Amino acid sequence: MPRLTSIVRLCLATLLLALVGCASTSGGNPLDPFEATNRKIDAFNESVDQAVLKPVAKSYQDYTPNLLQTTVKNFFGNLRDVWSVVNNGLQLKPKETAETGARVVVNSTIGLYGLIDVGTHIGLQRHTADFGQTLGYWGMPAGPYVVIPLLGPSTARDTAALLVDRHGDPWSQINPVASRNQGVALRLVDKRAQFLGMDDRLNEVALDKYSFVRDAYLQKRRAEVRRGPPSDVDELEEK
């Protein structure tokens, strides 16, 4: 299995070529000028999900003991908290930095390397943050909406931040590479399993699933960035 960074770079290169190929395309939504290409990539991602990822995630959910699923979720959540501490610090948020940092310390020690989420039980709230959010906090506009092959919804800003997020993930430092990739696959399957229950509901409420997911993603990212002080981050959205 290739290294995660190689996969991400391939996805980004594919996305760039696709967008360059339709650079003159004018979409109906100003936030989604590459909608025609994005829809094709989204359809490809959906086919991969239905053929591979969803069945594997369903088997994982059905046959893996709930306790083991919980420990997997807790372990990778604790790793994500490490990078959140860094980004909350970069956003000059002392409360969020301290509280998330305390979660990491407690869960990594008393919680046995994050397998047990002690932090939540003692009232330490999780404040998730990534580098795309940090860029937005400091005023970088989101840019156009894009769909990345195999990775899904994003924006120009979040795509630019993706490699930084990948390198900032503590799991990216794990060696040997085979063990690292096994963990990446397990985290992906576990994350997909957590959203299995949403599939039917999404199909029921969304007349156009692509538009629904796009609008929900953009709204979520705006809300996450707006946790900080006002900036021109929403300049594109407000036009």
Q: Where on the chain are the PLM-derived regions?
A:
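A structured, mid-to-C-terminal "fold-capping" secondary-structure block
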Residues: 26, 35, 133, 138-239
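Active-site flanking loop/helix segments enriched in acidic
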Residues: 63-70
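Post-signal peptide N-terminal segment of mature Sec-exported envelope proteins
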Residues: 29-59, 77
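Bacterial Sec-type N-terminal signal peptides, specifically the leucine/valine-rich hydrophobic h-region
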Residues: 17-19
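Mid-length scaffold segments of soluble, non-membrane domains
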Residues: 78-156
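Beta-rich strand-turn-strand
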Residues: 72-75
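Bacterial N-terminal signal peptides that target proteins for export
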Residues: 1-12
